[in-house]
Curated annotation (Swiss-Prot):
It catalyses: sulfate + ATP + H(+) = adenosine 5'-phosphosulfate + diphosphate. Heterodimer composed of CysD, the smaller subunit, and CysN. GO terms for biological process: hydrogen sulfide biosynthetic process; sulfate assimilation. SUPFAM superfamilies: Adenine nucleotide alpha hydrolases-like. This is Sulfate adenylyltransferase subunit 2. It comes from Azotobacter vinelandii (strain DJ / ATCC BAA-1303). With CysN forms the ATP sulfurylase (ATPS) that catalyzes the adenylation of sulfate producing adenosine 5'-phosphosulfate (APS) and diphosphate, the first enzymatic step in sulfur assimilation pathway. APS synthesis involves the formation of a high-energy phosphoric-sulfuric acid anhydride bond driven by GTP hydrolysis by CysN coupled to ATP hydrolysis by CysD. The gene is cysD.
Length: 305
């Protein structure tokens, strides 16, 4: 009698099926690579889906120029080791305007450097499908998003104009200029992600592991001192409050907009144990999620991931 699939193997099989469906159904797909743990799992699944061949689509990083330095080093290392075709896009208009999260705030920085940057890249290369690592358990607007998330010709998401998804049947029909955002990890939880990383020994950015790091508390959020740019925007009193703490990150984004959590979880088993006990969302440290009520849904309506 054949062994029953474990919970993680079922999730793995579902995700691989979705990835293969997209590769077969669309003319020009791309995998968005944000360098975080979910991207690491999604990339691992994609490589499994087409092993021993190479990925039949490129990976793309929409770079805000404000990621953690360790993230950039990790990205370059993975691309070299895996032989990936990497596209990196930075919004030139944002660079020309000197957009940054300190002077312009999280909402404007995210809109110009992430949302507009993504739309520029999708238009430039003519991608008709884009894989993303979002999960339904992360945030309420993502909880109601389809696996195949339809976007109009301006990349906008209308939650009231989405297609039914029955069982594992997905409708990828689009007109010229329209596209689909595809979320193969929709049914995974944060705990599933960590258990899978542990079982498959997937490399991840070291920032996920607890270590002594320099941080400053701003509005209740622990912000890591990642490079000298942040010091230009701190007062003398704030600089005096910089201290070293044992912290790690549950989610990774632009470093001035991503809060660390105090933790001693320095190994994968430690992190899994911590996940079994925690009762807070991993996105509690994302400053952009607190821009206003329904801020994530509004960002997605404008074309955000």
């Amino acid at each position: 009698m054949a062994d029953k699939l474990t919970h993680l193997k079922q999730l793995e099989a579902e995700s691989i099926h979705i990835i293969r469906e997209v590769a077969a159904e669309f003319d020009n797909p791309v995998m968005l690579y944000s360098i975080g743990k979910d991207s690491a799992v999604m990339l691992h699944l994609a490589r499994k889906a087409f092993f021993p061949g190479k990925l039949p689509f490129p990976v793309m990083h929409v770079d805000t120029q404000w990621k953690f330095q360790e993230m950039y080093r990790f990205r370059d290392k993975m691309v070299a080791e895996m032989g990936l075709e990497l596209i990196t896009h930075v919004n030139p208009d944002g660079v020309a305007q000197g957009i940054n999260p300190f002077t312009h705030g999280s909402a404007k920085h995210t809109d110009i450097m992430k949302t507009e940057g993504l739309k520029q890249a999708l238009d430039k290369y003519g991608f008709d499908a884009a894989f993303g690592g979002a999960r339904r358990d992360e945030e309420k607007s993502r909880a109601k998003e389809r696996v195949y998330s339809f976007r109009d010709s301006k990349h906008r998401w209308d939650p009231k104009n989405q297609r039914p998804e029955l069982w594992n049947v997905y409708n990828g029909k689009v007109k010229k200029g329209e596209s689909i955002r595809v979320f193969p990890l929709s049914n995974w939880t944060e705990l599933d992600i960590w258990q899978y990383i542990y079982l498959e020994q997937i490399p991840i950015v070291p920032l996920y592991f607890a270590a002594e790091r320099e941080v400053i508390e701003k509005n209740g959020t622990l912000i890591m001192i990642d490079d000298d740019r942040i010091l230009e925007h701190l007062s003398a009193e704030e600089k005096a409050r910089i201290q070293k703490k044992m912290v790690r990150f549950r989610t990774l984004g632009c470093y001035p907009l991503t809060g660390a959590v105090e933790s001693t979880a320095a190994t994968l088993p430690d992190i899994i144990q911590e996940m079994l006990l925690t009762r807070t969302s991993e996105r509690q440290g994302r400053v952009i999620d607190h821009d206003g009520a329904g801020s994530m849904e509004e960002k997605k309506r404008q074309g955000y991931f």
